[in-house]
A protein has these predicted regions:
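Extracellular "spike/adhesin" assembly and maturation modules
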Residues: 1-19
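Extracellular and organelle-lumenal recognition/adhesion modules and their flexible linkers in secreted
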Residues: 3-4, 20-346
Length: 346
């Protein structure tokens, strides 16, 4: 877009229309004309938790990657566990009420760093651009630094978290490499390692809130999105549903179910259930609960995700029973607090 040149810059009357604005200063009107998503972190305020409500402390076993709230994964390195707590309705020093995520090291004395991350999906247009990360935090861990990993390597910015267990606001920059590929993971670590590289002490913790990644070299106010907007952004990577979709029996023990995703997923997802089994899955109207497995198969998109629309695909459900080929049905998960899982996360 060409820059707009005006004779009276920075003066836009409250009743201005687009024609009037065309005579204004470009830097003033550009944010209005080009408004869009600012925060490339998804669920930076921890409202979306499709896997369950983790308001109670969750024990994360050693060397085990766990996602509690959407898009945030933690993995304790070393021989001990860490505790993840999802705190709701906290109040920050500026008076804003929000949620926070807290990671606390257990009795582990050989864990050299925190590994709580969000992987932001990269795109080519990010090449050579500068992004700013900002968030609120509190910690008791001395000499703690954050970290990021781009498509080339991992780096610790020259900033340190204040270990006084009070809330502080911090921002730091990510200068992207000159050639950023599509679909790679840009890892954001709000806290990572002590400057000395010493192991974490037992009881060391990091708690953080309102995480933002935005284009440019200045941290601006947090971008608030509606719950529905945030959920749809999270759906690109992970979805849970109690109704999978309708379809037809392709054979006596094989049901083809057509899945229509609310948004295009990052790639063809892996299907599973919350329980890990299939005994709570029913194909109406049979009420047999005899599903033995499921996978994304016949007729589904398998191409490059930067040109393919992974929003419609076929799931084949196998059964131990028999039904007439050509009959229709609806695949549902309707007992024991179970649900379908579609996973296409980074």
């Amino acid at each position: 877009m060409s820059k707009l040149v005006g004779t009276s810059p920075n003066q836009i009357p409250s009743n201005a229309d687009l024609g009037t604005m065309a005579y204004q200063n470009y830097d003033t009107v550009a944010p209005v004309l080009m408004a869009g998503k600012k925060n490339y972190i998804i669920n930076g305020d921890f409202r979306i938790s499709q896997r369950g409500d983790y308001t109670s402390a969750y024990t994360n076993a050693s060397n085990t990657a766990v996602t509690t709230v959407d898009r945030w994964q933690n993995r304790p390195y070393g021989s001990g566990s860490q505790t993840i707590t999802h705190n709701k309705n906290i109040t920050l020093p500026n008076g804003i009420k929000t949620n926070s995520l807290r990671i606390e090291n257990g009795s582990n004395t050989d864990c050299s760093f925190f590994h709580i991350i969000q992987s932001v999906e990269s795109e080519e247009w990010m090449s050579g651009r500068t992004f700013t990360i900002s968030y609120w935090y509190k910690t008791n861990s001395t000499e703690m630094q954050p970290r990021y990993c781009d498509s080339i390597g991992c780096f610790k910015p020259d900033v340190y978290l204040i270990p006084d267990e009070e809330w502080h606001f911090i921002s730091w920059k990510i200068p992207m490499p000159t050639n950023v590929p599509f679909g790679s993971g840009i890892q954001i670590h709000p806290a990572f390692q002590k400057k000395s590289s010493d192991p974490l002490d037992p009881g060391d913790y990091i708690e953080f809130a309102l995480v933002q990644m935005e284009l440019g070299d200045v941290a601006t106010s947090y971008e608030w999105r509606s719950f529905n907007e945030e959920l749809l952004l999270a759906y690109r990577y992970y979805q849970t549903h109690t109704v999978l979709g309708s379809g037809t029996w392709n054979g006596p023990g094989s049901f083809f179910c057509v899945v229509n995703s609310p948004v295009p997923m990052r790639e063809v997802p892996v299907i599973s259930t919350k329980s890990g089994g299939w005994s709570n899955i029913n194909i109406e109207y049979d009420d047999a609960y005899n599903v033995t497995g499921g996978s994304v198969t016949h007729g589904s998109v398998q191409g490059s995700t930067d040109i393919s629309d992974v929003s419609k695909f076929v799931v084949t459900l196998t059964t131990s029973g028999s039904q007439t080929t050509g009959y229709g049905g609806v695949a549902v998960c309707d007992r024991n607090n179970d649900w379908f899982v579609l996973d296409a996360d980074l």
